[in-house]
């Protein structure tokens, strides 16, 4: 047994003691060992809520109530400022639902998000969220350029961790759907907080020529003035583990790579990464 002052929880507390902000953490090695720090605290979700829209699309498709190949049209009512590529295609652009969903995750496309909320329905998405046991998470609205001050959604570290634990186990909708969604999350571009401290040798296989399936991150982040959130699964040869970090109450509102949430999030992420590898698939001996 580790010294009581040197448990993972206490080491994370020690690592974060200099952070002038609030950071909550949820980690699960998927072998019965969970690390929690404010895991049930509610946060503004920002773009992390998009994981549930993706999950709902696959669930509805599996139930025959939607189609991944349905043709969705970008209309004026879907427009919103912020991240994404669909706006570059112009109004009237038509894409398959699966491609809209991929853009929603990979480049956090806000217009894609509105197109899918329109296609699936707000109530259907929230019913899916409840159905997988994420009882403290809710999508409140679609995105609009004139209401950034209103919450897009509410989420907790534990609920986000539950989503990715189900995904890792192949239990999110179905094994086939879980694999498809995992592949989408693997290509997500904005993962600095979660993956920034993992050696680039593993995260840039095109340059290192390492097996791209050796170690990878499948995740989704979300950030606005009020929060910086990042969570997902980290795949290793010993299996997957789940890590979610959510940060708020910070002074610096700028989107910068040296933001305190990124610096301290990287430290926590690397600590868990090293622990999991050293113990060959566990957080605890």
At which residue positions do the language-model features occur?
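Short, glycine/proline-biased beta-turn/loop segments that scaffold the active-site neighborhood
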Residues: 63-89
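Structured C-terminal helix/loop/strand segments within mature extracytoplasmic catalytic/sensor domains
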Residues: 2-14, 34, 170-192, 196, ...
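Active-site SXXK
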Residues: 44-72, 243
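Mid-domain, small-residue-enriched loop/turn segments at the edges of structured enzyme/sensor domains
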Residues: 19-23, 115-172
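Conserved catalytic neighborhood of penicillin-recognizing serine enzymes
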Residues: 79-114, 153
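Beta-lactamase-like hydrolase cores
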Residues: 1-44
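Short glycine/serine- and small hydrophobic-enriched flexible loop segments
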Residues: 55-63, 106, 118, 162-169, ...
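A short glycine/serine-rich beta->alpha loop
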Residues: 37-44, 90, 97, 101, ...
